[in-house]
UniProtKB/Swiss-Prot annotation:
Keywords: Hydrolase, Multifunctional enzyme, Purine biosynthesis, Transferase. The keyword Transferase applies. It catalyses: (6R)-10-formyltetrahydrofolate + 5-amino-1-(5-phospho-beta-D-ribosyl)imidazole-4-carboxamide = 5-formamido-1-(5-phospho-D-ribosyl)imidazole-4-carboxamide + (6S)-5,6,7,8-tetrahydrofolate; IMP + H2O = 5-formamido-1-(5-phospho-D-ribosyl)imidazole-4-carboxamide. It comes from Streptococcus suis (strain 05ZYH33). This is Bifunctional purine biosynthesis protein PurH. CDD domains: IMPCH (cd01421). The keyword Secreted does not apply. One of its GO terms (molecular function) is IMP cyclohydrolase activity.
Length: 515
């Protein structure tokens, strides 16, 4: 019995050559619409879909393959006599191979000029139905959704007359992943269209970006997946100009770095980061001077760290960075001279280019945190704050310099692991106290790091002070200005302590926990 293939693709890469080889192997080809035209023009003999169904394509192509003569040919089990008899009785020809890819729904909704009606018209119905029918009956039917699988399928058919069961099973699994992802994108689009922010079912789809050697530790397997709807301002979208592949820990640190730098737009800023905590942040009138401040903030911790800059890296800045061992540098661009300097004898240094203005057009994604048996979903902490909304709660008002330093410190504190404390002036971080289980311990760590540079310094806390002992420690160190969210039942104790020592303290009303 002659084998039959049904081919209907939107991605026509390689399909003519694939069909030509099938016909050489004695296969009949059923085809539809534009695919049939392409094959006919290439001299490949095809059977029109309406010759199989006995029913014309209609409703602008919405109805063409949804027919028993198609799905019966796909779903009939070859090992069940009653199925074969039913096919014979109803003159349904068996179909042994399906090659289908779907209407470009994702590409359509990414178009800047997309309309709702256009998106709806690009929802494929017949394609997924054929794929699912063929995949369900993979014991007998081969189903192909990815042109990358054409050589394997052709090779096995040429060698043994049909594909192997393991290949059919693998391809069926790929199809179900593909159709599930396709439906997930459609569901996400409609969910956003109707403004549903707490759907009772959450289905998200990501595409494999990079297999990884291992995860956070060598004993952990890992891979890097990216959002199926690309986000321009992301590590997945960054262009790598030099160095080894990014590791699992590199990607997490790099992601933390670009989250931090996005809050510093107005002035040239450099952030040095280690284990997802900022170890040095500097801002100035030039990117070179901002680097100087970031490096000076903590010249020890920056070793083996990540540096992100919000302006083009010039030769002068590159000359200063080059002697330092860094894992990654991220910037919107590099001068040719700077790139030559940074890559000289530094083949492992990962240099990434990421357009920072891309964040203006990028959707701010939800954050997902896996827990045993579930998933936590939240908005990113990207609230826009205005110092005009802050409240001075002490008798002493901040000076102009203290206001500038507190604004800088508050932006910086947002990305320190809780309990997070950061000490800065208006140019650079001076001390960082991250991730302690009590806040006063974080205060002490930050003070110890900043101890000889506290003149004119301010301190920021990512959450309120539960007790006045924090303020007492701060005052004893000689720091004169504090910025914190407020909100403790003992706020007045902290205010009284600040007044006792002549400190100024500002409440922002916004907490920035980071676990």
């Amino acid at each position: 019995m002659t084998k039959r293939a049904l081919i209907s693709v939107s991605d026509k890469n390689g399909i003519v050559e694939f069909a030509q080889e099938l016909t050489k192997l004695g296969w009949e080809i059923i085809s539809t619409g534009g695919t049939k035209v392409a094959l006919d023009n290439a001299g490949v003999a095809t059977i029109a879909i309406d010759d199989v169904t006995g029913f014309p394509e209609m409703m602008d192509g919405r109805v063409k393959t949804l027919h028993p003569n198609i799905h019966g040919g796909l779903l009939a089990r070859r090992d069940v006599d009653s199925h074969l008899q039913a096919a014979k009785d109803h003159e349904i020809g068996l179909i042994d191979l399906v090659v289908v890819n779907l209407y470009p729904f994702k590409e359509t909704i990414l178009r800047p000029d997309v309309t709702y009606d256009l998106a709806v018209e690009n929802i494929d119905i017949g394609g997924p139905s054929m794929l699912r029918s063929a995949a369900k009956n993979h014991a007998s039917v081969t189903v192909v959704v990815d042109p990358a699988d054409y050589p394997t399928v052709l090779g096995e058919i040429a060698e043994q007359g049909q594909t192997t069961y393991p290949t059919r099973q693998r391809l069926a699994a790929k199809v179900f992943r593909h159709t599930a992802a396709y439906d997930a994108l459609i569901a996400d689009y409609f969910t956003k269209q109707v403004g549903e922010d707490k759907p009772e079912k959450l289905t998200i789809t990501y595409d494999l970006n990079q297999p990884m050697r291992y995860g956070e530790n060598p004993q952990q397997n890992a891979d890097f997946y990216q959002n199926a709807l690309p986000t321009d301002y992301s590590i997945a979208a960054a262009k790598q100009l030099n160095g080894k592949e990014l590791s699992f820990n590199n990607i997490r640190d790099a992601d933390a770095a670009i989250r931090i730098i996005r809050d510093f737009k107005d002035r040239p800023t450099v952030v040095a980061l280690k284990h997802m905590n900022p170890c040095g942040i500097g801002q100035a009138e030039t990117i070179e001077k901002a680097w100087d401040y970031a490096y000076e903030a903590d010249p020890v911790s920056i070793f083996g760290g990540i540096v992100v800059l919000n302006r083009e890296v010039d030769a002068a800045t590159a000359e200063k960075m080059h002697p330092i061992f860094l894992e990654i540098i991220i910037a919107p661009s590099y001068s040719a001279e700077a790139l030559a300097i940074l890559t000289n004898k530094k083949k492992n240094l990962r240099i990434l280019e990421l357009a920072f203005d891309a964040q203006d057009a990028s959707e701010v994604e939800k954050e997902f945190t896996g827990v045993v048996g579930g998933l936590l979903v939240q908005d990113q902490d990207v609230v826009v704050e205005s110092p005009a909304d802050w409240q001075v709660v002490t008798e002493r008002q901040p000076s102009e310099q203290e206001w500038a330093a507190m604004e800088f410190a508050w932006k910086s504190s947002k990305y320190v692991k809780s309990n997070g404390i950061i000490i800065t002036n208006d140019k650079m971080t001076l001390g960082v106290g991250p991730g302690q289980t009590n806040r006063v311990a974080s205060v002490r760590i930050a003070i110890e790091q900043a101890k000889d540079r506290l003149e004119g310094a301010v301190l920021a806390s990512d959450a309120f002070f539960p007790f006045a002992d924090n303020v007492e420690e701060i005052a004893a160190a000689g720091i004169k200005a504090i910025i914190q969210p407020g909100g403790s039942v003992r706020d007045q104790d902290s205010i009284d302590m600040a007044n006792k020592y002549g400190l100024t303290m500002v409440f922002t009303g916004v907490r920035h926990f980071r676990h």
